[in-house]
Regions:
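Intramembrane alpha-helical segments
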Residues: 2, 9-10, 83-173
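Alpha-helical transmembrane segments and their lipid-water interface positions
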Residues: 17-23, 64, 68, 76, ...
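Peri-membrane helix termini and adjoining interfacial loops of integral membrane proteins
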Residues: 35-36, 73-80, 167-172
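Multi-pass membrane catalytic core of lipid/isoprenoid biosynthesis enzymes
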Residues: 54-55, 73-126, 216-254
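Residue-level recognition of pore/gate-forming positions within transmembrane alpha-helices
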Residues: 24-25, 57, 100-104, 130-133, ...
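C-terminal membrane-associated helical module and adjoining short loops/tails
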Residues: 1-19, 138, 156-159, 169-312
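Membrane-embedded alpha-helical segments that form the functional core of polytopic membrane enzymes
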Residues: 21-71, 106-107, 120-134, 178-203
Length: 312
């Protein structure tokens, strides 16, 4: 029983789900709520609806993780045989059932939030996320970059959807908000999420070259080679570092020394370390360590939202 529960928790990739929940809740309370308070209006997702929105995102992501592993069993037996869960701890039929249940609950929860808060089209966007994750699992992840870009966009959507759910009803009603501030921070964090997710997805493809090539996948590293994949990742890391440097210089103008120090130590320096490791890594173990480092940079990026409470 305990083995089954532990296997299920690993199958849905609980750390990634915590990231999603944390991102959406923090963004609500550090960006959206202050902007609404400034305008003298109650947030659309007040009364606990932000937690339901985050839960719906978590459910959809969990369902997507399950269906991804379902279609990847043979590949995972080559790339990471010790981490295969479906068919070893959880029957394939149960995996499909859990995917359907979790995804359906995520969509229905989105519809419920839409009906109660008038967050228009939220149910439809949740359904679109489920469909994209399914198509990714059966087709897109085996093709060069298309699957990587889909996951990067969905990662960015975890930020965008909060602003979408909070503001689309206000636009429909013609209400006035300090929307420029919300928009600026929304695209800042969504862009940060997109770049890091894209980098991580390509690094994971570099890690999984052996199993992917054996089963006919045409990922970027397989099609163009590891060196081309390194250059692709390096370009995005340079973009990321440039943006982080600009952001650090910007906050220093206001004397926000603690924020600048945090950004330098926990975002810029780890990103430089990642860049250096990129051209020294040659095997799956090295690429896995790089993928883990990207996750820590993501977490550090999410936690920068806490500084918004101090400065904005």
């Amino acid at each position: 029983m305990l083995k089954g529960i532990n296997a299920f928790i690993r199958l849905i990739r609980w750390p990634n789900l915590v990231f999603i929940f944390l991102t959406q809740v923090l963004f609500e309370f550090t960006v959206i709520v202050p902007a609404f308070n400034e305008a003298g209006k109650p947030p659309n997702l007040s009364g606990g609806y932000i937690y339901l929105l985050a839960l719906s995102s978590v459910l959809i992501a969990a369902g997507g993780n399950i269906i991804n592993d379902y279609f990847d069993i043979n590949i995972d037996l080559v790339n990471k045989p010790g981490k295969v869960i479906i068919s070893k701890y959880i029957h394939r039929h149960w995996a499909i059932l859990w995917h359907i249940v979790l995804s359906l609950c995520g969509v229905l929860l989105g519809i419920f939030i839409e009906l109660r808060t008038h967050a228009y089209l939220l149910g439809l966007t949740n359904l679109a996320c489920v469909v994209l994750l399914f198509i990714y699992s059966i087709v897109l992840k085996r093709k060069p970059l298309s699957g990587n870009i889909v996951i990067a966009l969905l990662t960015a959507w975890t930020v965008l959807v909060v602003t979408f759910a909070e503001t689309n009803v206000l636009f429909a009603e013609g209400s006035v908000l300090p929307i420029s501030k919300i928009t600026r921070l929304t695209f800042l964090y969504a862009g940060f999420a997109f770049i890091l997710a894209l980098v991580r997805e390509v690094i994971k493809d570099m890690e999984d070259v052996n199993g992917d090539s054996r089963y006919g996948c045409r990922t970027f590293p397989i099609l163009f080679g590891l060196n081309a994949a390194r250059i692709f990742v390096a370009v995005w890391l340079v973009v990321l570092l440039a943006l982080l440097a600009i952001m650090t210089i910007y906050v220093l103008q206001f004397g926000w020394w603690l924020s600048a120090l945090y950004c330098t130590v926990l975002l810029i320096l780890p990103s430089i370390k990642l860049f250096k490791k990129l051209f020294k890594s040659n095997d799956g173990k090295d690429f896995h360590a790089m993928s883990s480092l990207v996750k820590w940079i993501m977490l550090a990026g999410i936690l920068t939202m806490l500084f918004l409470v101090l400065h904005i």
